[in-house]
């Protein structure tokens, strides 16, 4: 559970687990606690009661990539995220590999300000990869993107979570219900609690039926 200093309870005895890699989506109304839950998982804030057990190395990706991309080029941006124990001789290969995984392999020296919104979001994903993160916390990563860029980000994340060699786990907050059809499981967040995990299509139909009432 978690409450803000003013006493407003945002997370209320929330309990859930993710047992395997994949793309898992959360949906819910504004103020239901989704983003606060991400901050708890990432360690940015601590729960007021209860515990969080996370064996993953989490990394946040936000709605607007401009808020987290700080350097002038793709290469210099990824240099910020590389763990300090990586030998200098391996830096280039690690950066290039991360860019290729998000389909930006030709963008090493590309100025970030020339990238499209979808490319910037994929660069943010590359930053998570190069940091050796294996848990992506994606807070509405396609909310500001056009349909083509939205699909490009979904495609990359789906590929990362279903890789046979080294799949990662992604938890994705969405308000775009059509995205639910891409996930391995989805749940509705309401009043600070997560409901049961179901297929994305089942959650989609449940939300559609609620909207028609």
Regions found by a protein language model. Name each.
Residues 193-213:
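Conserved beta-strand-loop-alpha-helix hinge in the C-terminal portion
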Residues 42:
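Helix-to-loop junction immediately C-terminal to a conserved catalytic motif
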Residues 89-107:
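Conserved ABC ATPase "signature" region
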Residues 111-115, 119:
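Conserved ABC ATPase signature
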Residues 27-29:
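The feature captures the beta-strand-to-loop junction immediately N-terminal to the Walker
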Residues 125:
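Hydrophobic anchor residue at the start of the ABC signature
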Residues 136-140:
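Catalytic Walker B motif of ABC-type/P-loop ATPase nucleotide-binding domains
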